[in-house]
Structures are given as structure tokens and as C-alpha cells.
Amino acid sequence: MSDTREMLASMAPDELRSAMRTLGYRTQNDLAQAIGVSRSAVSLWLEGKVGVPRPVAMLLRMLVAAQRRVY
């Protein structure tokens, strides 16, 4: 996998927090319900204990980009 693809696939906890703020998710539970995962999964991602799955990272980045285009 190229470095660019790896960079796009991974999402650091700080980027996840930023995406949550941008998209209006105030709690881990809010995000978990919106994307259909458990709150504990979101917690593990935010703590950096488990990586954010590539499809989730890509979805959140697309939603953030769309949100920014609206404003």
C-alpha cells in the first residue's frame, strides 16, 4: 500500500475528535449511534487503542468535506 493510501486510510484520535465536532456529535454515543457501532468502539478509537476502520475514516472525511462546502 502506498504512503498516500495509508495516510488516507488511517485516522488519528485528534482527527476523529475534530470530525465529531465539525459534524455536531457531542458524545461518543452520538457518533456511535449515527454510524452504527458501539460506544465502546468509539472510545477505543479516541483513546488510540484501536485504529479507526478504513470505511469509517473515509465516511467521516467525506461528511466533513460536505459539511464544509455547505458553509
Which residues make up each language-model segment?
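DNA major-groove recognition helix of helix-turn-helix/homeodomain DNA-binding modules
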Residues: R54-Y71
